[in-house]
Amino acid sequence: MNMKLKTLFAAAFAVVGFCSTASAVTYPLPTDGSRLVGQNQVITIPEGNTQPLEYFAAEYQMGLSNMMEANPGVDTFLPKGGTVLNIPQQLILPDTVHEGIVINSAEMRLYYYPKGTNTVIVLPIGIGQLGKDTPINWTTKVERKKAGPTWTPTAKMHAEYRAAGEPLPAVVPAGPDNPMGLYALYIGRLYAIHGTNANFGIGLRVSHGCVRLRNEDIKFLFEKVPVGTRVQFIDEPVKATTEPDGSRYIEVHNPLSTTEAQFEGQEIVPITLTKSVQTVTGQPDVDQVVLDEAIKNRSGMPVRLN
């Protein structure tokens, strides 16, 4: 995570290929083996703008990290009027089974594949802080759901909040002030997919390890996702695909920080290309200059390689 994103967290308190249903963005699944879905948008910030970047991220169902990757250098607190913003709504589907819920921590997105619909719903998420990481490489299921969840902090959480001068009760009651929001899907090992009591944090590392969504998004999942639904956690910062027409694309996100120096932006997080990605990038028709630029820029948007 770069310094700008860290500072932001500390200070925060007719498109082709998909459609919006309630608050969720739904993409039809390609039937020809393609993994590339959606189209990017470009918008212009209105003159006299008084809204932070989070406002535009929420308006277009993006996480803050997605918007910052696609728009390097943009003022996150108050984008200037006339600023052109990329809305990264084109993406490569993760290289895993299209079933249940897939959570890609590296891109801070949740994919939900409703059974029998040939669609995928993509929602932005907030994940665990450095040292309080959201699980990766874990497959589980929705064990139960609850409207109006309570929150029972662990002993470590009590100590942390007490040290900050904000002692917690033994149990935080349900309601709008509960950090878990108004709905929760419990998935085992003390983890949950839940809402929030804040108006920021989606697309950031803000939780104690759980998956956080905007309140309208967790309400959508609560109403649509059955108990027993498969949930898979992956960590896939780089995705690549060879499409049915032979075109090759790569989508590069900044990998999750694993050290404080990386989190503070003092060191670049290294990128390792998996074997499945290399089967795409290693083809003789790939433009290596374009590939190198895509890896360097880490825009979070698919880039054509050939």
UniProtKB/Swiss-Prot annotation:
Keywords: Cell shape, Cell wall biogenesis/degradation, Glycosyltransferase, Hydrolase, Peptidoglycan synthesis, Periplasm, Signal, Transferase. It is found in: Periplasm. InterPro entries: LD-transpeptidase, LD_TPept_cat_dom, Ldt_C, Transpep_catalytic_dom. It comes from the Bacteria. Disruption phenotype: Simultaneous disruption of erfK, ybiS, ycfS and ynhG leads to loss of covalent anchoring of the major outer membrane lipoprotein (Lpp) to the peptidoglycan. Complementation with ybiS restores most of this anchoring. GO terms for cellular component: outer membrane-bounded periplasmic space. GO terms for biological process: cell wall organization; peptidoglycan-protein cross-linking; regulation of cell shape. In vivo a sulfenic acid can be formed on Cys-210, which probably inactivates the protein. This disulfide is subsequently reduced by DsbG and DsbC. Residues 1-24 form the signal peptide. Gene3D superfamilies: L,D-transpeptidase catalytic domain-like (2.40.440.10). Pfam families: Ldt_C, YkuD. Residues 99-234 form the L,D-TPase catalytic domain. The keyword Repressor does not apply. Its EC number is 2.-.-.-. The active site is at H194, C210. One of its GO terms (molecular function) is glycosyltransferase activity. Pathway: Cell wall biogenesis; peptidoglycan biosynthesis. Interacts with DsbG. Responsible, at least in part, for anchoring of the major outer membrane lipoprotein (Lpp, also known as the Braun lipoprotein) to the peptidoglycan via a meso-diaminopimelyl-L-Lys- bond on the terminal residue of Lpp. Can be oxidized in vivo, its reduction depends preferentially on DsbG, although DsbC is able to partially replace DsbG. Belongs to the YkuD family. This is Probable L,D-transpeptidase YbiS. The lineage of its organism: Bacteria, Pseudomonadati, Pseudomonadota, Gammaproteobacteria, Enterobacterales. The gene is ybiS.
